[in-house]
């Protein structure tokens, strides 16, 4: 009986020591000030639409391209569609908008860095930023009659050429006319509010790899 009591006492002491050790183990603490990157996928396969994005909240809003459109068969005008609405119709506070592979900003400026990972961009570039520019008959808005050789274009669009470099078009000389690859670069965008964002585009197609215009990107948004 005495031996049994001694064994029980030893077990209790060991249990207390194990509990004490587990309680003394420090809990991991989050790194102060570290910003976690977010990820977003935008279905931009409809040539008629732009998806407007609030990088701070993750909200999106889809609108038809607001400009007038002209459809061509080679150099011959087939039809014209009048402008409808304006960017004032966008209800969210938007930072960037995506149309297929095209990107524009809300009065922002963008620069391409030499880095390929978001967390490697620890300081913002001080030069090289480019604002959006107006382009004519560059943005395709209607491919519904492509098999008849008819393609519709926005008569005027605002695009950010720097951000548009996220995907590289490689002519094939046959059909399909292009193959694509990612630039892999991290882009920095400064907004008129004083906020900024780092973006890296990571995919241009859906999970099957067969449907282009499904745009995925990771980003870090920094408010003013």
Locate predicted features:
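Surface-exposed, beta-sheet-biased, low-hydrophobicity segments with strongly acidic/polar composition
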Residues: 24-224
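Sec-dependent N-terminal signal peptides
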Residues: 6-15
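C-terminal motif of bacterial Sec signal peptides marking the signal peptidase cleavage site
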Residues: 17-20
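Intrinsic disorder/low-complexity signal
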Residues: 5-7, 22-26
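N-terminal secretory signal peptides that target proteins for export/translocation
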Residues: 1-3
């Amino acid at each position: 009986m005495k031996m049994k009591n001694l064994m029980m006492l030893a077990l209790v002491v060991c249990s207390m020591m194990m509990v004490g050790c587990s309680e003394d183990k420090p809990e991991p603490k989050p790194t102060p000030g570290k910003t976690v990157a977010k990820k977003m996928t935008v279905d931009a396969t409809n040539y008629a639409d732009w998806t407007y994005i609030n990088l701070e909240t993750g909200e999106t809003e889809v609108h038809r391209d607001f400009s007038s459109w002209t459809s061509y068969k080679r150099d011959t005008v087939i039809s014209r569609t009048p402008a409808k609405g304006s960017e004032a119709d966008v209800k969210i506070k938007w930072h960037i908008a995506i149309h297929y592979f095209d990107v524009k900003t809300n009065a922002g400026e963008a620069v391409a860095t030499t880095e390929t990972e978001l967390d490697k961009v620890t300081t913002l570039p001080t030069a090289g930023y480019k604002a959006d520019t107006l382009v004519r008959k560059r943005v395709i808005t209607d491919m519904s009659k492509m098999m008849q050789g008819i393609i519709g274009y926005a008569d005027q669009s605002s695009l950010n050429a720097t951000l548009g470099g996220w995907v590289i078009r490689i002519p094939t000389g046959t059909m399909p006319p292009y193959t694509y690859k990612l630039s892999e670069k991290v882009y920095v965008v400064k907004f008129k509010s004083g906020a900024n964002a780092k973006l890296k585009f990571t995919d241009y197609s859906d999970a099957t790899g067969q449907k282009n215009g499904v745009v995925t990107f990771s980003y870090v948004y920094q408010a003013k």
